[in-house]
Amino acid sequence: FAFLLLVLCINAQATHLIGGNLGYEYIGTVIVGGVTKYRYKIILTTYTNCGPDANPAFQIEPEQGPLFAGIYEHDIAGLPLGGADKPLIDTVGLNRIDTTKITPELPSSCTVGARTCIFEAVYVGFINLDLNFTGYHVFYERCCRNGSIENLLTPGSEGLAFDAYIGPPLVGNSSPVFTDVPIPFLCVGDTTSILNTAVDPDGDNLVYSFVDPYAGYSGPGAPAPLPPDPTLGWPVPSVTWGGGYNALQPFGAAGYSFINGATGLTAYYSPLVGDYVVAVEITEYNASGNIVGITRRDL
């Protein structure tokens, strides 16, 4: 079999950041100036190519940071993906706390090339939120994607963005935690299963789905912008797919993709060698059936 690498690149120079996800952890209440606030840890995980085909090649380590995410107030209770533009209420700096060189699981049925040097970097920051009954969005973006991506129309000029929805603070929700490494290597002509396993610390019901990856508002002229201010334009722009590709058919009509909505188990088949973008979203429902969180990962 030939070799297929499923990747996403968001480095300012392109070609070295190949994936990631954005989440959060509820810490508890704190008193600030006599007012009760709700404290959260914001967690950004990135996966960086440190091989010879990266830019820069043979990267020593991912950037130190801080990276900056925006905190925006949601405007419609019960509709976390609806509403109008979201007002910026704060910016949080995310500092790198851990870097690990990882070895992703590689398929045994095809030859793997040079793209097996990968750094996992974890960035964290803390934010105190006011009580509201609509929730908040955490937003982070970067440009540009790898120009070799097959299933996007103009990948080299499109950015990548993450948006995580935090339910109303009284819920005290933490986002699901992915337990696998989202760097899937596939063999052309061979169907491969990827777990996308996540554990929810609150015991919420998780529903998995394929979605359009976010492109955001960054671009080649502004590859690492500060969070949009004064508002986050809503909805966040998605990528522009190439002809014949979409969220449900990321490998085209001749390919195959499947996701189990209850478990996150995915299966992929591609008839062609190339770099492809896939996004998986997790929606959290509490025991009352209310949406309390939305997160996603880009592969």
Which positions does each model-derived feature cover?
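Generic detector of short alpha-helix boundary/capping microenvironments
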Residues: 2-3, 177
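N-terminal signal peptide c-region/cleavage motif recognized by signal peptidases
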Residues: 7-9
